[in-house]
């Protein structure tokens, strides 16, 4: 499925927080390195939770990454010997990320992106739905609901231990102090009808 001698393609890894998206991205990048392929990893500058220059999973796995402010800055770091381009926290990139990913895949690169497919309200997040639509491979991961133990497909934002309101700002970078994985039935967003 992931032969490098094929022309370029797009892989999307998505799901809720704590579902293992960054861990899976790191695993795929490490596999390419074992195969002596050249990979480069990018992350948005806004994601500085664990490290400024690494993609770090919640369980501590990490890989070196290039922080970028704008999607098109990715092009400045691509060289001909690259085989694989990986992008973590893709939901935080600007709208140009879809075009950037398309161009890279069309140029023959394997492009792996990872990100949240839904925001804390349970709505499609950023450009991830568009990337899912154009990808050759989509992997949707689930966490475990912190309230009941069921498979969790949503991310619950908590403010002082209570669910955040529907009209709170969409982007709030954080980890377990601000977010929990939840299933459809335990996910709560005050002032929104289900």
From Swiss-Prot:
The active site is at residue 89. It catalyses: thymidine + ATP = dTMP + ADP + H(+). Its main location: cytoplasm. It comes from the Bacteria. GO terms for molecular function: ATP binding; thymidine kinase activity; zinc ion binding. Zn(2+) binds at residues 145, 148, 183, 186. It is found in: Cytoplasm. Substrate binds at residues 120, 170-174, 179. It is an enzyme of class 2 (transferase). PROSITE patterns: TK_CELLULAR_TYPE. Gene3D superfamilies: 3.30.60.20, P-loop containing nucleotide triphosphate hydrolases. The keyword Metal-binding applies. One of its GO terms (cellular component) is cytosol. ATP binds at residues 15-22, 88-91. GO terms for biological process: DNA biosynthetic process; thymidine metabolic process. Its EC number is 2.7.1.21. Keywords: ATP-binding, Cytoplasm, DNA synthesis, Kinase, Metal-binding, Nucleotide-binding, Transferase, Zinc. Belongs to the thymidine kinase family. Homotetramer. This is Thymidine kinase. It comes from Bacillus anthracis. The gene is tdk.
